[in-house]
From Swiss-Prot:
Catalyzes the ADP transfer from ATP to D-glycero-beta-D-manno-heptose 1-phosphate, yielding ADP-D-glycero-beta-D-manno-heptose. Pathway: Nucleotide-sugar biosynthesis; ADP-L-glycero-beta-D-manno-heptose biosynthesis; ADP-L-glycero-beta-D-manno-heptose from D-glycero-beta-D-manno-heptose 7-phosphate: step 1/4; Nucleotide-sugar biosynthesis; ADP-L-glycero-beta-D-manno-heptose biosynthesis; ADP-L-glycero-beta-D-manno-heptose from D-glycero-beta-D-manno-heptose 7-phosphate: step 3/4. InterPro entries: Bifunc_HldE, Carboh/pur_kinase_PfkB_CS, Cyt_trans-like, PfkB_dom, RfaE_dom_I, RfaE_dom_II, Ribokinase-like, Rossmann-like_a/b/a_fold. GO terms for cellular component: cytosol. This is Bifunctional protein HldE. Residues 344-477 are annotated as: Cytidylyltransferase. Residues 1-319 are annotated as: Ribokinase. Homodimer. The keyword Cytoplasm does not apply.
Length: 477
């Protein structure tokens, strides 16, 4: 199924975890201190943003969702500032304020878009345990479509199993962003989202995707977790579910500017998508797009619905048009990874007419992506005789690629497209005319792979041969 934006405004997501306040001091630097070999920064702007679980909730709100946030803070001004930032962004805050403790604060000094130093202000929350959040957490489960556990190993989620058990009792899926090397503490979770370094710290180095999948499946079974989504930086992300085919998505970032908080964006988009009823692979595809957007921003940041919509449009348009066969196979694999159904047809398409256009629109309606395989000039000549084609293959393909219904056009040189159809193995193979499905080139390969073959009607009164005859019989002017 083609990926579309779900009704995010209907998604209620409960986020629980470690809360922190991110502060940014921006300034210019053009000299070295006489006191020590360090740059002198002239601070011109001070910025504050929610971090940790707060950034996850902020990402949910930026998508239009309804986040409920539970976590531990101190009884201090930083907690007040954090609550104000979040509530102004549409996040409902349910803080457990611990007397005598300080809210975790991280200060970053930035000049010319480069982070010069980070200062952490934190003493932890001695004696804190995840079960301490249950009084705020449990009443919020009713009506939530997903739970996110955002673990930064600061104490709020020390032994998160009581929170997972409460959510599962309420029938709410649980997504956890893990920390540490013991993933068994997330037993019962629907999904955990380690990055590659965190994953390999537990299972060892994975030299290839097959190893990653094999070890991921074993880890999921061992820890009692339904699925793992391993984020792999520039290599994209991989979804591993025991007993199901893995899903690998390529990274979508055009330029990586700052990876701070990218994991928060991924899990927030996943949870918000799942809370609207999206299947996990579809939510994963949206999360992959969101990650590609957010790493192009500085610091902990969010992704808007408008940005996601634009990224979806760009993704749909990218790679469209005339492709070589290797390029086509790569595009098909990527489309399938995003849950899209592939339709394929073929023909000479020498003189494009209204019948062709109507036929291709019918074909496109059978799935999400339409491939048109086009006979090259020598192939047309063998089939139609001397004098054909009227238009060379590059022109025929260019015209087809300009149609809104057509995604990809590929040439073939054989008398039939059986070989290229067998390489693509479309979900739906279509042909126009009065053929029997079994007589269609590529039928056996498509059906054997679980696809189907469909015969479509041509538009009456439209024929390339008739057009040629009319042109030949027309009086000279």
């Amino acid at each position: 199924m083609k990926i579309t934006l779900p009704p995010f405004d209907q998604a209620r997501v409960l986020v629980a975890g470690d809360l922190m306040l991110d502060r940014y001091w921006h300034g210019g630097t053009d000299r070295i201190s006489p006191e020590a070999p360090v740059p002198v920064v002239h601070v011109r702007d001070i910025e504050q943003r929610p971090g940790g679980a707060g950034n996850v909730a902020l990402n949910v709100a930026a998508l239009g969702g309804q986040p409920e946030l539970v976590g531990i803070t101190g009884q201090d001004e930083a907690a007040n500032e954090l609550a104000s930032l979040l509530e102004n962004a549409g996040v409902a805050c349910h803080f457990r304020r611990q007397p005598g403790a300080a809210t975790i604060t991280k200060l970053r000094v930035i000049s010319r878009h480069q982070q010069l130093i980070r200062l952490d202000f934190e003493d932890g929350f001695p004696g804190a345990h995840a079960r301490d959040l249950l009084p705020q957490y449990r009443p919020l489960l009713a009506g939530c479509g997903a739970v996110v556990l955002s673990d930064y190993a600061k104490g709020a989620l020390r032994d998160p199993r009581p929170l997972i058990e409460a959510a599962r009792e309420a029938g709410v899926p649980v997504l956890a962003d893990p920390k540490g090397r013991d993933f068994s503490i997330y037993r019962g979770a629907t999904l955990i989202t380690p990055n590659l370094a965190e994953f390999e710290a537990v299972v060892g180095r994975c030299a290839d995707e097959d190893t990653l999948v094999r070890r991921g499946e074993a880890l999921a079974r061992e820890c009692g977790i339904e699925a793992l989504l391993v984020t792999r930086g520039e290599d994209g992300m991989s979804l591993v579910r025991p007993g199901e085919a893995p899903v690998h998505l390529a990274a979508r970032a055009r330029e990586v500017f700052d990876v701070t908080g990218a994991g928060d964006t991924v899990i927030a988009t996943l949870a918000t998508g799942l809370a609207t009823g999206l299947a996990l692979p579809q939510a994963m595809a949206l999360a992959n797009l969101a990650a590609g957007i957010v790493v192009g921003k500085l610091g902990t940041a969010t992704v808007s619905v408008a940005e996601l919509r634009r990224a979806l449009q760009e993704q749909e348009q990218s790679g469209r048009g005339v492709l070589t066969e290797p390029e086509l196979l790569h595009a098909v694999a990527d489309a399938r990874a995003h849950g899209e159904r592939i339709v394929m047809t073929n023909g000479c398409f020498d003189l494009l007419h209204a019948g062709h256009v109507a036929y291709l629109e019918q074909a496109r309606s059978r799935g999400d992506r339409l491939i048109v395989a086009v006979n090259d000039d020598a192939s047309v000549r063998r089939l139609k005789g001397e004098g054909r084609p009227i238009n060379p293959v590059q022109q025929r393909m260019a015209v087809l690629a300009g149609l809104a219904s057509v995604d990809w056009v590929v040439p073939f040189s054989e008398d039939t497209p059986a070989r290229v159809i067998g390489a693509v193995l479309p979900d739906v193979l279509v042909k126009g005319g009065d053929y029997q499905p079994e007589a269609i080139a590529g039928h056996d390969a498509v059906v054997a792979h679980g696809g189907r073959v469909e015969i479509l009607d041509f538009l009456d009164g439209c024929s390339t041969s008739a057009m040629i005859e009319r042109m030949q019989s027309a009086p000279d002017t």
